[in-house]
Amino acid sequence: ATHNCYGVDLNPTAVDLAKVSMWLNIIYKHSKTPWFNLRLSSGNSLIGARLQVFKEADLKSKRGRGVENYLDRVPERINLINGRHDDEIYHFFIPDVGMAGFDKDKVIKGLLPDEVKTIKDWRKPFTEEFTYAQIRTLKRLSNKVDELLTSHLNNRERLLKATDDNIPIWPNSNKTEGLPIKAKELQEKDLYRATSAYRKLKLMMDYWCSLWFWPIEKAGDLPT
């Protein structure tokens, strides 16, 4: 069960209850307490960045009559095994016209006209086509994401193996002692430490997500 169940919930208590429920369903005499921390966690399963990319050509195109660019495209999902191509840029480095979309709401436009104007003035240059220099920077950033992603996946795989509880099944009766819960939690803490690959990736993705929910009263602080 610890190898095949995955889940996420906004409520940490619901996550803990799920762990207890799973444990009660697989418990047997002399069994160890299963450890689900790397597979059941608290978070938002509906909002977030994904491993999807835009093509370099879409970023260069100037949007106009009969011409589409990245603002009209849906980013393509990449396969972790095959990886990302050199002409592809991760979508969480790319702006979207839906970010800070308060100017689409008639009520808010009537209540906060100055802030809405600030957002509209910000969005126009923010969503322009990219220059060649900017695309080179985006490529370097995407390459760095590849490195961080590989590092995190390797670290997680090592932790999964280190925290695995082997169950002896006849005729193979070799019994190995697994790590105690406290030791597993310490290794998990190291995986998510402030300077880890995971935290660096999360910071980039959280920044992109924040632009969709930017508080209108701070419209003047929107990044350029």
Locate the predicted segments by residue.
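SAM-dependent methyltransferase catalytic region
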Residues: A1-T224
